[in-house]
């Protein structure tokens, strides 16, 4: 496609610079054929946005609340590669908002952070989830209560698949008391604007968060 910038009260020189910037932002599919002496000032694609709070990019880093109980268990999540939420539309809708490629930091209430992973398949009702050719509910889950309300779309558990990049047992959860680390009772929350928590996650799990984001 051809992109043309229309602006008022800009010199030709300034308008060209604005146009070049917009072309850069529009991504890898467009080529900026006007190079000039400003070319060296443009960062590589998919780099600057990873360090800018609130920048619009494809995937994000999110806090995920494990919420252990009768229908969910961290051991199951870690062993089989998934996360879940359900029991009501307010929790269902939160897990449905995860996108493929999002990075999640799993938090276990009363313990700390227990894993970092990448969403590989968006959430669907647990009754529809097939894992390695078998229904998830056919596996020997620690919490078989996951099958509760399986035919009720409002109350059913919803499951998203995850590729765990780093995990620990619940007893080894990563936490630092009175340090201001971010937590919330929500199922999902952005870790944008939480630099201290992100830094703690990176050091605790020996991962570079920007390198994980697409």
What does each of the following model-derived ranges do?
Residues 1-54:
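Structure-specific nucleic-acid interaction/processing domains
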Residues 28, 39-69, 84-90, 127-214:
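Contiguous surface segments at macromolecular interaction interfaces
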Residues 95-99:
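Short, well-ordered loop/turn sites that connect or cap secondary structure elements
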Residues 113-125:
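Short beta-strand-centered aromatic/proline hotspots
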């Amino acid at each position: 496609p051809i992109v043309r910038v229309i602006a008022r009260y800009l010199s030709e020189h300034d308008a060209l610079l604005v146009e070049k910037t917009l072309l850069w932002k529009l991504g890898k599919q467009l080529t900026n054929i006007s190079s000039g002496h400003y070319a060296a000032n443009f960062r590589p694609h998919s780099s600057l946005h990873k360090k800018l709070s609130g920048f619009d990019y494809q995937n994000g880093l999110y806090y995920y609340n494990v919420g252990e109980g009768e229908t969910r268990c961290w051991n199951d999540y870690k062993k089989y590669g998934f996360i879940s939420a359900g029991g009501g539309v307010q929790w269902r809708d939160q897990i449905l908002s995860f996108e493929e490629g999002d990075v999640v930091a799993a938090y276990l209430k009363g313990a700390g952070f227990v894993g970092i992973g990448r969403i590989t398949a968006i959430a669907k009702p647990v009754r529809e989830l097939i894992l390695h050719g078998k229904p998830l509910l056919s596996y020997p889950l620690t919490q078989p209560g996951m099958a509760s309300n399986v035919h009720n779309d409002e109350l059913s558990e919803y499951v998203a698949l995850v590729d765990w990049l780093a995990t620990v047992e619940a007893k080894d959860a990563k936490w630092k008391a009175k340090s201001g680390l971010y937590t919330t009772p929500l199922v999902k929350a952005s870790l944008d604007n939480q630099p201290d928590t992100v830094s703690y996650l990176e050091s605790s799990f020996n991962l570079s968060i920007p390198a994980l984001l697409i």
